[in-house]
């Protein structure tokens, strides 16, 4: 995340951005890299067990315990954000009743326009080459449906950039610039600066 923020600081005034961290968990991984550089920070986390830890790790942030996906899909958040970081799980997830309710960032990112005004920077994780992929048939099925491809175990950066540009454009936002940053062996940060058409 350090490289991502350094890249962004050369292009935008980070200190003027109202940021949102989605799937906050403890807030002790990459969130601390940018938390004190932005104008404001709101963190969304579904599990209340993380609330006090989040408050400790991110004392200046506004912590909200809620279902992030339900909140954006149903347009329940009145605030708009300029920097949105989606640190989603890399599989399907949900409730005990519906464990495969959501998948990666898919359900969230399709509704990103609900929390953006005129422009925003979106940072999200992409698993280009999932490992043990065949052991998770529901995850595989959801990826195939979202990306519109039969094989999603190896997605090229070229395909992914084109796919997300088209997805954002369909939602009324053009891509001003984008960049990929390696996070881990199979995981990259995708950074998109979006502007309303």
What kind of region is each of these model predictions?
Residues 153-171:
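Short alpha-helix
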Residues 47-49:
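Conserved SAM/SAH-binding beta-strand->alpha-helix loop
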Residues 54-55:
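Conserved SAM-binding loop
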Residues 26-38:
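Conserved SAM-binding loop of SAM-dependent methyltransferases across substrates and taxa
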Residues 100-121:
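A short glycine-rich, Lys/Arg-flanked "PGG" loop and its adjoining helix->strand segment in the class I
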Residues 73-88:
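A short acidic, Gly/Pro-enriched loop at the edge of an enzyme's catalytic core
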